[in-house]
UniProtKB/Swiss-Prot annotation:
PANTHER family in the record: UVRABC SYSTEM PROTEIN B (PTHR24029:SF0)
Name used for this protein in its record: UvrABC system protein B
Keywords for this protein: ATP-binding, Cytoplasm, DNA damage, DNA excision, DNA repair, Excision nuclease, Nucleotide-binding, SOS response
Organism: Anaplasma marginale (strain St. Maries)
Principal subcellular localization: cytoplasm
CDD domains, per database record: DEXHc_UvrB (cd17916), SF2_C_UvrB (cd18790)
Pfam families named among the record's database cross-references: Helicase_C, ResIII, UVR, UvrB, UvrB_inter
Primary role: The UvrABC repair system catalyzes the recognition and processing of DNA lesions. A damage recognition complex composed of 2 UvrA and 2 UvrB subunits scans DNA for abnormalities. Upon binding of the UvrA(2)B(2) complex to a putative damaged site, the DNA wraps around one UvrB monomer. DNA wrap is dependent on ATP binding by UvrB and probably causes local melting of the DNA helix, facilitating insertion of UvrB beta-hairpin between the DNA strands. Then UvrB probes one DNA strand for the presence of a lesion.
The keyword Aminoacyl-tRNA synthetase appears for this protein: no
Entry GO terms, CC: cytoplasm; excinuclease repair complex
GO MF annotation, one: DNA binding
Gene: uvrB
Family: Belongs to the UvrB family.
Length: 651
């Protein structure tokens, strides 16, 4: 069995050894929950990796957004190059949920754009969890959403070995059952036959094909082939073909599920008729019968996840299968930036109840569709394994769960202190932050500026660009892989200033940043709370020149508390440096190959002159409006905007 082994030129230093020992001791003694309070730049990721190495237990690290998850994934891959470090996030680049608007009698069909590369990584994650123990999965909260049963997924795999008696026709039937497509194109999830050779492109790989040669009904050879060059890269003795969908179901189970679906359909149609809802009764019968026929013929149908209750053999109201069910019982769960991630997990369940209720009440879906859902918070609590909450500002929940006790990690291995905080008046803040940015850039450093709204971020970006500054903005409308690319460009110097809103807080690891400007710091609210301010201040804590300017006309309670906590930490760090004769130095961290490059992001290279083309500007604005309408459940308007975008982008 492959063991976890960290590959790093660094050794634990500062208070890292104490934090690692404390967490490992707690896990060894059976502590179910612990909290690591670690300041930005103190090496929390290295501490997590060290805990994994010392305990030799599989792990899942949950982050609250895809950008942070991608960053953690890159770091963990560098620490564990010989182990399986996987990435599991939502594979939707665009998602318009199925919905019905009763007021206008408009049904909106589900519309989604799936990122095939992220789907590949999801399959790679589940495959690794089922095949080996040296696995670290970095995930978003997508890990608490419904996923196919791990038992069925594992049961459906097809093992093949040299010398095995195997009928090629039966193997082709099995591959179709696993949702592989027959075709000559070398694409993931396809297979083809040429004479006595069957070629299959596995669901969890993007760069290799397995060629299985037969001599009669016996497997004669198994070769791994590069799909681009056609060269044989490896000769194998055995392989295991995993399903091309997490919702594959053995034929007998599928037929049993169809029987149960038909029973519910009869009951549902009868209830509608008894209520004199003839249109709804006809609608549910027509739609469900079509799905049933598709499942009988192909083993799947559009929206098959809505029948997951039956496919997984569950009762009404039972928790769905999720990625957590694929984890070994002794796995460790790290909740990164827990003050943000835990509330996000808590909020997931209620998100789509109203939308599904409308679909069910009007005959578009049966009540069993409600079981296609994320875990409730209580269900997540029941299923979570050994947990370590990780944050510079742990929330009330985490501290309650651990009895108010947290393992502190305040000393940075580099000797860096928390940044100096300066308060300046908010009047004239734009001019001042511009001048401060130019001075910082002239010294070869980067700048982060945080605003209160997306519009402010975009306007400030446009203004700074007009003034000759290389700048980009970062907010929730920017696609996942594009965010990763923008952060990489900032580190490489393609851009010098990054303007953002809430995304500027947790997890942005940019050692080149020597200035953080917080506009309107005295506007009390979520974005300017004590926790938010401490997190934002921490973005400047990776550079020896790091400083923070808070623009405010009054010092609020949140500002005072944040600055006092920063000063407390600075005092502890300064004393430690004096006692150990440490001279602070800026973190040295190479810019690694971005996830978007590795998964082959299909997006075009982001232009740093965004919104200069009027047509492009119109499309960007329409996309923002469409997403806002979807968030507000105005699906009818969202569809109209989507159609307009398609018209504008048509060749």
């Amino acid at each position: 069995m492959q063991r976890f082994k960290i590959s790093s030129e660094f050794n634990p230093s500062g208070d890292q050894p104490g934090a690692i020992d404390s967490l490992v001791r707690g896990i060894s003694c059976g502590a179910k929950e612990q909290t690591l309070l670690g300041v930005t730049g103190s090496g929390k990721t290295f501490t997590m990796a060290s805990v994994i190495e010392q305990t030799q237990r599989p792990a899942i690290i949950i982050a609250h957004n895809k950008t942070l998850a991608a960053q953690l994934h890159e770091e963990m891959r560098s620490f564990f190059p010989e182990n399986a470090v996987e990435y599991f996030v939502s594979y939707y680049d665009y998602y318009q949920p199925e919905a019905y608007i009763p007021q206008s009698d408009v049904y909106i069909e589900k519309d989604a754009l799936i990122n095939d590369k992220i789907d590949l990584l999801r399959h790679s994650a589940t495959r690794s969890l089922l095949e080996r123990r040296d696995v670290v999965v970095v995930a978003s909260v997508s890990c608490i959403y419904g996923l196919g049963s791990p038992e069925l997924y594992s049961e459906m795999t097809v093992p093949i070995a040299l010398g095995m008696k195997l009928d090629m026709c039966q193997l082709q039937e099995r591959l179709v059952e696993l949702q592989y497509k027959h075709g000559n194109r070398y694409e993931r999830g396809n297979f083809s036959v040429q004479g006595d050779v069957l070629s299959v492109f596995p669901s969890h790989y993007e760069d290799r094909i397995w060629k299985i040669s037969f001599f009669g009904d016996e497997v004669d050879s198994i070769q791994e082939v590069d799909p681009k060059s056609g060269m044989v890269t490896l000769k194998l003795e055995k392989i295991k073909i995993f399903p091309n969908s997490h919702y594959v179901t053995p034929r007998p189970t599928l037929l049993q599920a169809i029987s149960e679906i038909e029973k519910e359909l009869d009951e549902c149609a009868l209830q509608f008729k008894q209520c004199n809802k003839i249109v709804e009764a006809d609608r549910i019968v027509e739609r469900t019968r079509f799905d049933i026929e598709m499942m009988r013929e192909t083993g799947t149908c559009k929206g098959i996840e809505n029948y997951s209750r039956y496919l997984c053999g569950k009762e009404a109201g039972d928790p769905p299968n999720t990625l957590l069910d694929y984890l070994p019982q002794d796995a460790i769960m790290f909740i990164d930036e827990s003050h943000m991630t835990v509330p996000q997990i808590r909020a997931m369940y209620n998100g789509d109840r109203m939308r599904k209720a409308n679909l069910i009440n009007h005959g578009f879906r049966m009540p069993s569709a409600l079981d296609n859902r994320p875990l409730t918070f209580a269900e997540w609590e029941d299923r979570k394994p050994t947990v370590v909450y990780v944050s510079a500002t742990p929330g009330q929940y985490e501290l309650q769960q651990t009895g108010g006790v947290a393992t502190e990690q305040l000393i940075r291995p580099t000797g860096l202190l928390d940044p100096v905080c300066i308060v300046k008046g908010a009047d004239g803040q734009i001019h001042d932050v511009m001048c401060e940015s130019q001075a910082t850039i002239a010294r070869g450093y980067r700048v982060l500026i945080t605003t209160l709204t997306k519009k402010m971020a975009e306007n400030l970006t446009e203004y700074m660009r007009e003034m000759g500054i290389k700048v980009a903005y970062l907010h929730s409308d920017v696609k996942t892989l594009e965010r990763i690319e923008i952060i990489s460009d900032l580190r490489l110097g393609v851009i010098d200033v990054l303007v953002g809103v809430n995304l500027m807080r947790e997890g942005l690891d940019i050692p080149e940043c020597a200035l953080v400007g917080i506009l309107d710091a005295d506007k009390e609210g979520f974005l300017r709370s004590t926790t938010s301010l401490i997190q934002t201040i921490g973005r400047a804590a990776r550079n020896v020149e790091g400083r923070v300017i808070l623009y405010a006309n009054v010092i609020t309670k949140s500002m005072r508390t944040a600055m006092e906590e920063t000063d407390r930490r600075r005092d502890i760090q300064r004393k430690y440096n004096q006692e150990h004769s440490i001279v602070p130095r800026t973190i040295q961290k190479p810019v690694q190959t971005s996830l978007s490059e590795r998964v082959g992001s299909s997006r075009k290279k982001v232009s740093r002159d965004t919104n200069t083309d009027p047509a492009n500007r119109d499309i960007v604005e329409l996309q923002k409006e469409m997403l806002l309408c979807a968030e507000n459940l105005d699906f009818e308007r969202a569809v109209e905007i989507r159609n307009e975008i398609k018209r504008l982008t048509a060749p």
